[in-house]
Amino acid sequence: MHDSSWTEADILGVCSFLDIPKTKIDPLLQVDAFTSILIPLISKSKDYESIKNDRIVTEVNYEQQLRNSEKKLLQSNERYDLLEDERKLLENELSQIKEYLREKSSSYDTVLHDCSSLKSVNEALKQAQDQNLKQTAQLQNLLSDKEKEVEKKITIIKDLKDALASSTHQVLELQHTQQEKASLQTNYEFELQKLTQKNSILENNNTWLSRELQGVNDKLLSLHQEASLEKSQLSSQLSDAVLEKDALQRKVSSLSQQFTESNLRYQNIVAELSEMRKQYEFSQVSFEKEISSQKQISELWMEKCEDCSLRLKELQNSNGELEKLLEAAQSSFEEQLESHKEAEASLKSQINFLEKEVSSLESQLKLANERLRHYDEIEISDMSELKYSNLLNNSMKGFKGQSSVSDLYSERLYYKQKYEQTCQEVERLQRSYNHVMEEANLQHPLVKEQFKRFAHMQREIVAMSEQYQKSLEDCQKAKSRYEQLETLFKDKCTENKHYEQETKDLARQVQVLLHELDLCENGIVLGVDSRKKINSYVEKSLTEDETDTDQIISSRLVVFRNIRELQQQNQNLLSAVHELADRMEKDEKPDLDGAEIQEETLIKANETIDQLTKMLEEVSDQLRYSLKERDFFRSLVQENEKLLDMAPATPNSKLNTNLIEQTSYQRSLIRLEQLTNELESLKSISRNKEKKFEEAISSLQLEKSNIQLQLTSLTSERSLALEKLNDLEKSLVLSERSKDELDESYKSLQEQLASKKIEVQNVSSQLSICNSQLEQSNHIVDNLKSENLLLTSVKDKLKADLSNLESKLSSLQQDNFHMKAQIESSNQEYTATVDSMNSRILELSNDLRVANSKLSECSDDVRRLTLQNSFDLREHQTLVLQLQSNITELKQDITLQRTVRNQLEIQTTELKERLKFMEERQENLQSKLIAANKDTTQNPDNVEVEAISIELERTKEKLRMAELEKSNIQQKYLASEKTLEMMNETHEQFKHLVESEISTREEKITSLRSELLDLNKRVEVLKEEKESSSKELAKQLEDAVREKDSALSFKKDYEKIRSDADRVITSLKEDIEKERSLMKECHSNYESEIVSHGRTTQKLRDLRTEFDEVNTKYLKLKANFEQQHSGLSGAEKDWNIQRKAMEDEISSLKDYILGLENQNKLLHSQFDSLSQQITVLQQNSSENLNISANLEAVQDNDLRELVSYLRHEKEIMDNKYELTILDNRGLNQQVKSLQSTVDSLQLELNRLQSLPVSNDQTDTPIISGSQEVQLLYESNSVLRKDNDAKLGKIQELEKEVEKLNASLNPLQTEINELKAEIGAKTASLNLMKEYNSRWKLRFQSVLNKYERVDPTQLEELKKNCEALEKEKQELETKLQETAKETDTFKQQVNSLNEEVENLKKEVEQANTKNTRLAAAWNEKCENLKKSSLTRFAHLKQELTNKNKELTSKNAENEAMQKEIESLKDSNHQLQESASSDAEQITKEQFEQLKSEKERTEKELADSKNELEHLQSEAVDADGKTEISNLEKEIHELRSDKEGLVQQVQNLSAELAALREHSPTQGSLENADEIARLRSQLESTKQYYEKEKETEILAARSELVAEKEKTKEELENQLNEKSQRIKELEEQAQKNSSENTHDNIDDMIKQQVEEKLKENSANFDVKLKKVVAETEFRSKAKISVYEKKTRDLQNKITQLEETIENLNKQLSNPEKTDESTSSVTETKPVTSKPTASKADVGQNATEASSAKREPSGKSLSARLQGTGKQKGVQRPAVSRPVPMKPDSGKLSITGASKRIATSKNAAQNAKELSSTAKSGSLKRQRDDANKGGSSSNQKKAK
């Protein structure tokens, strides 16, 4: 029986112990005999498991401890080796530094010697400088006196100029008053002439009216009889007229509404502008405030930055001092170490030598003793003498040996004493080193704090800089916003002006339209006179503010009565634009030619300038040499005169003369010797100076070379130290690699343990085979006992090993303590050396400063020399530039005079041509006036003829004056050319001299600069070497400190590791116990899970079967759902299309019915009014043509030609006048420049002549030398400042580098630590993964054995089942919703069908009405055509006559041009002859000519204005009014006709759409409807093309009108400014005639030119603004029209897409049949013939497009765009013409069909194939399911 004393876990433990399965033990448990055996087995199994676990734990712990101890030993050994290597390196560096210091001391002595010599030189230079300063002070006093005199003269000149200006102002005012009087008189005369002309016209009109009244009275009698008959007709027509009046009133109200809307828009725009201005002002104020605040912030930041910079400088100074102290200490320490090492080495060598000698003496003594013993044994008798001799020798040798040993002993004592002394010195040095290290440690926290402060300040500076940059960015953004607002404001202003103009034009148009409506209502037909009166009334209605250009635009461009008038206006504008462009090109050609001529003259002038400069240089050289010779000869003459005075007055004149000659000769020789001696002394002084400078430079170079050698040695040492450091780093890397290898080996051992466990399991399985052999179990038990004994022995051994390890650890700790003590001692020594090195570095820095000061003094001297040379060069350059400017001005004057001459010649030719032309014109006018005005009593044109004759006389006088002026200018030109040649010669001489001096001085400067650069480079190299050495020492110090810190951290880490190891051991033991308990619980849970797993497998199988059933049901439901969904989607699409079409049709039909009713009323009323108007027009036209043709035909044409000709001449004269003004400006500028150059040259010559001659020539080199010294001294101060600033920057950068290095080191340490942690974690993760994978494999193997299912799969299957059930429920709800929606759709379709039937009835009624209207309309059209054709024939005849007249006039113009060319040639010949014979003309005569010319031009302008006014009055007197009225009526009829056609087309399209959607109608009706829809689409395209063309023409006309407005405004501005320029020129000329002073003339001319320049600049700016505004407006309008065309194109593309969709639907007739059958199940389906796909789609889309775009623009742009996109050719569109059909209904013919290319067909085929492929996949299941349903339906049919 089973006993309850053990558990299942005990049984499992026995099974694992015996390697027997539980199935075999379970039957044995029921046996009582087995229970007695099982109890001891359970206890043994438990013991076995505990021993096994303990063994594993001990092995793991032992291995870990061994590895840790080995690692620690390796690390300690490596660190010890590193410290020893560093100590050796420091000793080597100390020895090198000592040598370096010795060399520096020697160089320092040489530098001091050089300084003393330089000081003596500086004192001599200072004395010379003082003398120079005194001389400069005297010269400055003279200059000040002269300047005062000049200022007095300038004040006098200014007073004279003011008086002159006041007098000129008074003269100008008088002239102005005279001109105003003359203009008033001319205006009065002109108005009288106008009044006389008007009176004559009114008298003619009265006579004509009296004649017409008589004819009208006769007709009234006949009409009175007919009136009684027509009263009955008029009563019926009154009702129609009332209706027409209502329609017109509606139009008027619509126009007034538009006007009010435009006013509202204008007001809104004004309000928006005011708001924008307010916002702009507010934003401007806010921006100013922000800018001020940002400025304050920036100032605060700058102050903070300055404070920070001061603090930084303080920190840098403190850090520099610390570094210097450390370097001095280090250097001293290294020196001491080197001395001690040398002493130790020498002592060791001596000791070794002494030891060798002592050993050799001892060996000799041994040999002697042995020999004595040997000789004692030998017989004394035979060898007595020999023994005696041997003994003597041996004794002598011993004596010698004893003496050498004593000497050695004494030397040994002496060296021992020295050794002790050296040891004492070493101890003393160590104490000092320790003291220095303590001081460094004390100052270390202070240094750290300073570094922290420095870092903090740097962060603050960075933050401040970022804020400053942000503020700058904000300022820039604010500025950009401000600019954007300004541009917006300008745009709004321009838009505002544009809207104002539009409102004015609209008001004008509205007034004209209202007037014409009133006339039409009253039935009044206006004639020529009445139109003139209306125009005068319109002109009076304009405001006074509007200019003449605005009146012209409002009367000619804004107001129009027909489309023809608009087209004519546009054509006129285009022709005017082309003419203007041609004229601009012609006007620009002479400017380009003049520019090329000016360029050539400039090139020649430059060449002459170069020649003049060369001549000037040569002349200046000659002057210098001549001055020197003159001074020399003066000195000789003075000396000779003194000798003559001193000589006695003897009678022998010959003797006196000989004496005088001899004495003079001797004196001259003495003087020459003195001069030569002085030159030699100066040369010697200069040589000495140069030698001294060279010596100083050589000494500095030697110092530099020495320093470079020392630096190279230091760099080599540094490289060696770096190599050693690299080796140490490599050793550390190797140690880390060894650590990693050990970790890997540990992992491999763990894997081996796992593999061994697996092998143990295999062995246990093998043992299970031998379960039958129970007898062997006893032997196994014995073996186990023996194994337990072995385990106990192993435990004892492990304990012994642990004790040994602990002892080793203690020894290691002791070694560590010793190492720390050694490290501390080495640190103390290191600090001592650092202090000594710092002191030495300070000394060296002082030496370097002294050397730098010497170098700076030398560089100052060099700089002074360079500055003096540059000063001289600048003076020469100024002289050269002045000469060049003078020459250029002379050349400009010459060119100006040439251009003036050419212009005068051109003017004379033109005036002669005009004279001839005016004479001919006068003759023609007189002949015409005599022929035309025989019947008239008065002759108003005589005044004009007289004025023209006066003008001719004046022009002749002007020609004479111009020729005289031409000759005067030629003489001036010749004189100026001569002066130019002289100036060129002098300029060239001066240029040669200046270039020679400049070249010599530049060579000197280059040599001095090269020397200075070399010195600066040397100094920089020395600085860099010093900085590098200081950096290396600092790095070494930091490394030593780090090593100390690392040693301390190592100690702490070791203690932590030991404590952690103890903790880990305890925690591992606890974990082992916990794991044992967990294993037991897991085993029990595993058994229970196996049992539950069997149950779940059965449930899973059941669930799988259920899931398969549910899945099959789901697939069936899904297939049904997809079928129904596809059917529903198709039905929805069809229903939506039908609904939209029906709604559109309903709305369009309602609108159409209302429109038809209104149109019927309008047609009736218009028909009656047209009949009346035609009769009245026929009567009036017959009478008017006979009367007015004879009177006005001749006058109108002549006047028009005169006006056009005079306008053309006026424009030409204006352009020429502007060109002459520009040329005059250029000439004036050139004259001024030449005069200024002449004045400057004269001043220079006077200055050179008045220069005083210096007697003291000996002092000149000293003065120049002192000036050079002073200049060098001043320049050297600048270099010092720059040097100090650069040194500060270098120090700051060095500190930043050090900080970065300091921050990098801890980061690297942290990175290494993190890497180590990551490696440990990755290893632990890998172990856990392996452990997990093993457990999973084991679990799966168990499941596979027992054939059970995984619980994770079970959970996944459950989730899938739940999701499928949710989907099933959702599909059911969707099916219910779709069924409800289908019911609602069916109801809506039935209601729509009822509405369609009602609409059909209404359409039939509308068709009957349309047939009646069409018949009446056709009759009216035919009548109108006949009447209009007759009128047009008459007009064509008139046009042909006018064309003939034009051709004849063109021939006359050509003949006139030929005569003009011949006159030009003759005029040119006359000018050439007149240039030789003409005399000079005074300025007063020239001014008179100009004044007369201006008067004639004014009179011409007045006459032209009068002619233009007459022409504007005569233009409206033509017989165009009747034609315009007819055209207007025809246009209205056409518009009504097109409206009817559109309405009919809309109705037909709607009917087609209804028939298309109603499935009960026949196929023949569908074909007719498709044809109608095609025609309707083409008609809509044509209609929209026409509308687009009209809109484009209107836009173009608007743009042209705006351009003309701007052009006229600019022309007015130009005329005003040209008048102002003329006035200024007159003022300048009068002033020049009255004043004689040339300087005053120049001032006046300058003022005039400045004003002209300002006016021209302002005008150019305004021109640019106006042009930019016009361009902007035109671009904006073009963009608006482009947007409209794009919208139309997009709509067309949408329509075409809908057509394609309908084609696709029609391509599947079976599907359409099925969809229709589903909608209408009760109605039978009839067979349809297949219609064309494109026709059906077009019908559907045309109806929708006609409804969507009733008021849109033309469709031509859209059709073109779509054609380009899809490769469709543009169709040949023909206008639809309504015809009267046989059936009584309207039909449209002439509509062209769209011709599709092969490309379009291919593309459509590809699209259909792609859609078919995409739809075929969706419909495969539908086809399978529909097979059965379709067969059943066929059977039912």
Swiss-Prot record:
Described purpose of this protein according to its UniProt entry: Functions as a component of the nuclear pore complex (NPC). NPC components, collectively referred to as nucleoporins (NUPs), can play the role of both NPC structural components and of docking or interaction partners for transiently associated nuclear transport factors. Active directional transport is assured by both, a Phe-Gly (FG) repeat affinity gradient for these transport factors across the NPC and a transport cofactor concentration gradient across the nuclear envelope.
InterPro entries: TPR/MLP1 (IPR012929)
Phosphoserine, modified sites: S1558, S1563
Disordered, as annotated region: 1464-1521, 1602-1642, 1700-1837
Location of Phosphothreonine modifications: T650, T1560
GO annotation, biological process: mRNA export from nucleus; protein import into nucleus
Coiled-coil region: 59-378, 415-519, 559-625, 661-1163, 1222-1637, 1675-1712
Name by which UniProt lists this protein: Nucleoporin nup211
Compositional bias per record (Basic and acidic residues), positions renumbered to this chain: 1480-1521, 1617-1628
GO cellular component, one term: nuclear periphery
Localization per record: Cytoplasm; Nucleus
PANTHER family: NUCLEOPORIN NUP211, NUCLEOPROTEIN TPR-RELATED
Source organism of this protein record: Schizosaccharomyces pombe (strain 972 / ATCC 24843) (Fission yeast)
Molecular function via GO: structural constituent of nuclear pore
